[in-house]
Amino acid sequence: MYQGKGTYLENYLDSISTLPSELGRNFALIRELDYRTSDLVEKIEKLKSNLLVTTNGTRRAVHELTDERASKHIKLEMKQVIEYSDEKVELSNQTYELIDKHIRKLDIDLKKFETELESAEEEKKKKKSKQSQNNSTVESSTTSSSSSSSSSSLSLSSSTNNTSSLNSSSGGGGGGSGGGGGGGGHSSHSTGNKKGKARDSLTSSSSSGNINGMSSSSSSSSSSSSLSSRKQKSMAAQDIASITGNNGDADVRVFNANPNDLDLAIDPNEPTYCFCNRVSFGEMVGCENPDCKIEWFHFECVGLTSTPKGKWYCPDCTRIKVKK
């Protein structure tokens, strides 16, 4: 556990609080022993001077008994000097060990503090790195959500614009088809009603899809909003053009839709056509029978590969005409 430099400093100061007094006591004892040793050495020197008398360069003993006593006295004093010296050495060793003990403790505490400091710094770096990663994840999620929202808004705006163009294009194409039919001599009341109904149903389909798309975009989650936007783009991308040949060709309606768009969810309000009961896509041909129940058919469902010449009737209406 990280204790902090303040804690280590307090503990160390507490441990050395008695050190000055201990050192002072030892030094005082050593000084006292020095004084005693000095006195003994001086005393021994005097005894030695009295023991040896030099006359004319020769040495002679004064009295045997006195010399023997003086010699024993000198030995005792020398022995005492040695004892004092041993005590001083012992006190010096104690003082050294006392100081060395505190130095070792200081080294151990410094090493421990350094290790704990490195661990604390490493843990702080890990926390900072983890916090940075979390912030990056949140920012990335926010950016992704913002991009998704912007993309959805752009898709909705594009779908609305395309749907408006679709409605105006459907109205203009219907008028052109009526004019072309009159010039070719094949325009009739039934055909006009039929085209008008088809235009109304297609326009209603586009408008319904647009309204449903905007409603689901505002009320559902971001995933359903994305699906609705894609469906709106698919429906709005169907470029509808009424083509009526000046030479009396059958009424053909072309839907430039991507076949992949058919895999998307179909709006239940969008009208269906043909025997297959599917929505409008690709090229479609209209039956000239005003009473036809289906009216519009996909080329592939009625076996057509190109625009038929003249008037065209669906298989059901053809059988009815043959019977009549």
From Swiss-Prot:
Residues at which Zn(2+) 1 binds: C274, C276, H298, C301
Compartment list: Nucleus
Phenotype of gene-disrupted mutants: Cells provided with nutrients proliferate slower than normal. Upon starvation, the progression of differentiation is delayed in a cell density-dependent manner. Cells form tiny aggregates and more aggregation centers compared to wild-type cells, resulting in a higher number of tiny migrating slugs. Cells form complete tiny fruiting bodies 3-4 hours faster than wild-type. In a similar manner to wild-type, most cells remain as non-aggregated single cells in the presence of caffeine, which is an inhibitor of adenylate cyclase activation.
Gene Ontology CC: nucleus; protein-containing complex
Keywords tagged on the record: Chromatin regulator, Growth regulation, Metal-binding, Nucleus, Transcription, Transcription regulation, Zinc, Zinc-finger
Protein name: Inhibitor of growth protein 1 homolog
Purpose of the protein: Involved in regulation of the growth and differentiation transition (GDT) process, probably by regulating gene expression via histone modification.
GO molecular function, one term: zinc ion binding
Biased composition (Low complexity): 140-169, 201-229
Native source organism of the sequence: Dictyostelium discoideum
Family listed: Belongs to the ING family.
InterPro entries (alphabetical): ING_fam, ING_N_histone-binding, Zinc_finger_PHD-type_CS, Znf_FYVE_PHD, Znf_PHD, Znf_PHD-finger, Znf_RING/FYVE/PHD
Region (Disordered): 120-237
Gene that this polypeptide is encoded by: dng1
Subunit structure: Interacts with H3K4me3 and to a lesser extent with H3K4me2.
Site (Histone H3K4me3 binding): Y273, M284, E288, W296
Compositional bias annotation for Gly residues: 170-186
Disulfide bonds, paired cysteine numbers: none
